[in-house]
UniProtKB/Swiss-Prot annotation:
Small subunit of the glutamine-dependent carbamoyl phosphate synthetase (CPSase). CPSase catalyzes the formation of carbamoyl phosphate from the ammonia moiety of glutamine, carbonate, and phosphate donated by ATP, constituting the first step of 2 biosynthetic pathways, one leading to arginine and/or urea and the other to pyrimidine nucleotides. The small subunit (glutamine amidotransferase) binds and cleaves glutamine to supply the large subunit with the substrate ammonia. Keywords: Amino-acid biosynthesis, Arginine biosynthesis, ATP-binding, Glutamine amidotransferase, Ligase, Nucleotide-binding, Pyrimidine biosynthesis. GO terms for molecular function: ATP binding; carbamoyl-phosphate synthase (glutamine-hydrolyzing) activity; glutaminase activity. This is Carbamoyl phosphate synthase small chain. It comes from Symbiobacterium thermophilum (strain DSM 24528 / JCM 14929 / IAM 14863 / T). The active site is at residues 248, 332, 334.
Length: 363
């Protein structure tokens, strides 16, 4: 770790010296979705559940074309998976993609270290069997960790060119900041005619597609790293009647466009079991989350209301504009992994699209 703390275990996957931001995920399942989630770009992920890999990897469970993590840390790695859809082991899959795995260490102690000291940078390094690192080697790893910078994250994972997924329903533009596949599947399952555009798209380029609604997707890194996206959302908001739905990083970018600020959390929210309270109804939702930043509630303008809060730390988990057709959530309604109860938010978005279309026709 960048503070000099050393955790030793057995190396699997690809041999490497790999630096990244070390974070932890509290999910019991869904490791394939985690490693292929573009929001984890540049991160070394510690799984707190003690046994990982027991159902292998499947052809259907990936959330993108490849793993995006810099490394995986587990207590116990199962190398003989059992599942009727498995096409291989997690270890072989990550090894083929150049991702190292560190297993056999005390992940509880590592997680408590991160909770106490905050998210920090670290290095996964493999040595020949039986070799022990000397002080000079450890010092070199510490310097490698401290030198790591997460730069150009969104650009690295987002689409470089627009593409369309035809459908019979309303025209929806999804701005890709690192979208998980299931966001697009949820939209197309509801009949949407989806056009996915790069994160660098301007408001003019988005509007030229004549969208009836816009989805701002999830993605990696800090929202302040994509100022061009903030300007794009401001341009969309200036239309006054275009429905917008922000998810995770998209939620944060929308908040910046509305004049709010964001800040980095001590150790983030990552897992499939985070309770969130919907303030209007008092209902509690169990949500899938993966974010290291949050919107500062005190920075929100009067026309924006907080709709959801985390029951863990009270941070903002949802926003809505009092006048414009915009709402956002910090968590992942598409799940994958995690509970599916929050998919109703896609229906809420499409209801907003329908109401906006009716208003336009009758204006």
């Amino acid at each position: 770790m960048e503070d000099g703390t050393l955790f030793a275990g057995a190396g699997f996957g690809a041999p490497a010296v790999q630096a990244g931001e070390v974070v932890f995920n509290t999910g019991m399942t869904g490791y394939q979705e985690v490693v292929t989630d573009p929001s984890y770009y540049g991160q070394i992920v510690v799984m707190t559940y003690p046994l990982i890999g027991n159902y292998g990897v499947t052809a259907a469970d990936g959330e993108s074309r490849q793993p995006w993590i810099r490394g995986l840390v587990v207590k116990e790695l199962c190398d003989r998976p059992s599942h009727w859809q498995a096409v291989g082991s997690l270890s072989d899959y990550l090894a083929g993609c150049g991702v190292p795995i560190l297993a056999g260490l005390d992940t509880r102690a590592l997680t408590r270290h991160l909770r106490s000291h905050g998210t920090m940078r670290g290095v996964i390094a493999t040595l020949p069997e039986g070799a022990e690192p000397g002080p000079a080697q450890v010092a070199a790893w510490v310097e490698t960790a401290r030198a790591f910078r997460l730069e150009g994250a969104v650009r690295s994972v987002a689409t470089a060119a627009p593409y369309r997924i035809p459908g019979p329903g309303p025209r929806v533009v999804a701005v890709d900041f690192g979208a998980k596949e299931n966001i697009l599947r949820e939209l197309t399952a509801r009949g949407c005619d989806v056009t996915v555009v790069p994160a660098t798209a301007s408001a003019e380029e988005v509007l030229s597609l004549r969208p009836e609604g816009v989805v701002l997707t999830n993605g990696p890194g800090a929202p302040t790293d994509v100022p061009e996206a903030v300007e794009m959302v401001r341009g969309l908001l200036s239309q006054g009647d275009l429905p917008i739905f922000g998810i995770c990083l998209g939620h944060q970018i929308a908040a910046l466009a509305l004049g709010a600020t964001t800040y980095k959390l001590p150790y983030g929210h990552r897992g499939a079991n985070h309770p969130v309270k919907e303030l209007a109804t008092g209902r509690i939702h169990i949500t899938s989350q993966n974010h290291g930043y949050a919107v500062a509630a005190e920075s929100l303008p009067p026309e924006v209301e907080v709709t959801h809060v985390s029951l863990h730390d009270g941070t903002v988990e949802g926003l809505a504009h009092r006048r414009l057709p915009l709402f956002t959530v910090q968590y992942h309604p598409e799940a994958c992994p995690g509970p599916r109860e929050n998919r109703y938010l896609f229906d809420r978005f499409l209801a907003l699209v329908d109401r906006s279309a009716v208003s336009t026709r009758t204006a």
